[in-house]
């Protein structure tokens, strides 16, 4: 039997998980090189978002994300146990637009060839794809001015 006579195995269609779709969206729209960068940056964007919203809202968002993807909910809550705990007890922070973006640039290790505001917008877009419109609107209410505009545009 020659190679042309060997029947090919049926190709399995593997559907990407919501978490993988989220990461892929951040990679493509943010101009990143890897899922690892997307994951690390998204975690810092989420951390900064949580800092400007009440704990109750943050917990509701985590629960909504958990219904879509446990890994995405885990990322929202924070993979760092100490930071996750602090997010539950600290008051809402007042963060200006430039500080919001600077935190992402500095804390997330955004690659030098990537604009922090662009990758933030990519995380916003990917997040809004999995959230209800009601939750997206509620988040917007707590974001500072220019950041809110970016969230609404995403």
Residues covered by each model-derived region:
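General marker for long, soluble alpha-helical cores
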Residues: 2-154
């Amino acid at each position: 039997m020659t190679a042309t006579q060997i029947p090919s195995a049926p190709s399995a269609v593997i559907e990407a998980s919501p978490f993988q779709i989220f990461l892929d969206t951040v990679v493509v729209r943010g101009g990143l090189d890897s899922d690892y960068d997307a994951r690390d940056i998204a975690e810092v964007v989420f951390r900064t978002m949580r800092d400007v919203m009440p704990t109750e809202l943050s917990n509701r968002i985590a629960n909504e994300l958990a219904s879509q993807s446990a890994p995405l909910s885990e990322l929202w809550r924070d993979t760092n146990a100490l930071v996750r705990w602090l997010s539950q007890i600290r008051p809402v922070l007042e963060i200006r637009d430039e500080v919001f973006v600077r935190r992402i640039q500095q804390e997330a290790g955004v690659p030098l060839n990537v604009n922090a505001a662009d990758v933030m917008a990519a995380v916003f877009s990917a997040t809004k794809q999995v959230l209800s419109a009601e939750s997206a609107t509620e988040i917007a209410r707590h974001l500072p001015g220019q950041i809110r505009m970016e969230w609404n545009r995403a």
